[in-house]
């Protein structure tokens, strides 16, 4: 199958992928190919191994789309007890192998390896990956928002970014920065309550629910003893959503499941690390912020197809290049 035929085939099943990858068409597939991997020196991987986490299916389909464009044989390691409804168009079957365990030969035969998971998972597979094999790791990251117009509309957009997928995955907002963060609390509480009514959060196991309850108790204690620096808003009778005002710029990893921090805007965002993206409201393109993705508030979970996940080009990162040097004739010396 030629590259053109393969891109035609992928474009024919775009409707299947687009809920997870964002919109693409035949033209955008060709443009990505021409931009990233059309050079004669490019060597396409024969076997591309994807080690997937169970947070959301989006990263899985986005990674697979990259491999399909390249024409690699995609070996997909699914989580043992997650992504149970993961499926693919039958016409793409020749490009894929799927397993919930990791066959021994997959790593040794991999021409490129893509891993999603914890930082510990990334270290584990990086140590097992030969140095010459392209390795792309997507580990712990989180999203933030910078809201300069704290309106009811902004609260609704933020609730969408917090609530979709229950903060599973690296794109979800965990911290919102504002000039007056405490004043935004009631607006966001109303918006999250409305979002919960329309999109109920998934049922939690005892451990996850307990983590939220423990954090709430800690925040109640702090708010009672230091009300200038702490305040808590919470869903009544459940752990459906939790909002914490903390008078500190430094982000804290939340337990997820619609738990978010409101913090004062720092004078410099450069100290923040491991960001997946920054949502802005109002939106304007900003190239001075320390994040691989800048986007309008409300669109955290919907990056464009073939985006540079974690700042890494999706196709170019998976290929290698071979340099063929011309023969240099030694010039004869003069007597």
Where are these regions (language model features)?
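N-terminal Rossmann-like NAD(P)+-binding subdomain of aldehyde/semialdehyde dehydrogenases
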Residues: 1-49, 58, 265-268, 275-286, ...
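Conserved small-residue-rich beta-alpha loop and adjacent elements
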Residues: 32-95
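Donor nucleotide-activated moiety binding/catalytic core segment of transferases
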Residues: 32-55, 99-107, 239-256
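Conserved NAD(P)+-binding/catalytic subdomain of aldehyde/semialdehyde dehydrogenases
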Residues: 47, 93-181, 307-333
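Short His-Asn-centered micro-motif
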Residues: 51-54, 77-80, 115-118, 138-139, ...
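Short, well-ordered alpha-helical microsegments
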Residues: 60, 121-123, 185, 286
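NAD(P)-dependent aldehyde/semialdehyde dehydrogenase
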Residues: 165-178, 182-328
């Amino acid at each position: 199958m030629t590259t053109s035929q393969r891109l035609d085939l992928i474009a024919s099943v775009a409707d299947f992928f687009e809920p997870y990858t964002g919109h693409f068409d035949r033209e955008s597939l060709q443009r990505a190919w021409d931009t990233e991997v059309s050079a004669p020196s490019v060597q396409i991987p024969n076997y591309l191994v994807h080690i997937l986490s169970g947070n959301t299916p989006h990263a899985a389909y986005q990674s697979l789309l990259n491999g399909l464009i390249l024409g690699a044989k995609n070996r997909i390691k699914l989580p043992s007890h997650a992504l149970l409804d993961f499926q693919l168009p039958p016409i793409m079957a020749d490009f894929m192998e799927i397993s919930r365990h990791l066959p021994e030969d997959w790593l040794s035969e991999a021409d490129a390896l893509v891993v999603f998971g914890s930082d510990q998972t990334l270290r584990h597979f990086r140590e097992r990956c030969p140095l010459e094999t392209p390795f792309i790791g997507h580990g712990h990251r989180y999203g933030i928002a910078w809201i300069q117009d704290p309106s009811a509309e902004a609260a609704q957009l933020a609730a969408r970014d917090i609530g979709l997928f229950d903060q599973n995955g690296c794109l979800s907002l965990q911290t919102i920065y504002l000039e007056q963060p405490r004043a935004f609390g009631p607006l966001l509480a109303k918006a999250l309550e409305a979002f919960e009514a329309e999109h109920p959060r998934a049922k939690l196991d005892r451990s996850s629910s307990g983590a939220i309850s423990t954090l709430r108790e800690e925040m109640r204690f702090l708010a009672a003893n230091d009300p200038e620096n702490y305040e808590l808003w919470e869903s009544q009778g459940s752990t459906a959503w939790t909002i914490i005002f903390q008078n500190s710029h430094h982000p804290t990893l939340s337990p997820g499941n619609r738990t978010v921090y409101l913090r004062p805007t720092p004078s410099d965002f450069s100290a923040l690390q491991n960001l997946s993206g920054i949502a802005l409201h109002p939106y304007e393109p900003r190239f001075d912020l320390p994040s691989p993705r800048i986007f309008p508030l409300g669109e955290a979970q919907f990056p464009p197809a073939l985006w540079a996940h974690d700042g890494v080009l999706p196709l170019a990162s998976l290929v290698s290049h071979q340099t063929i040097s011309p023969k240099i004739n030694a010039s004869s010396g003069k007597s």
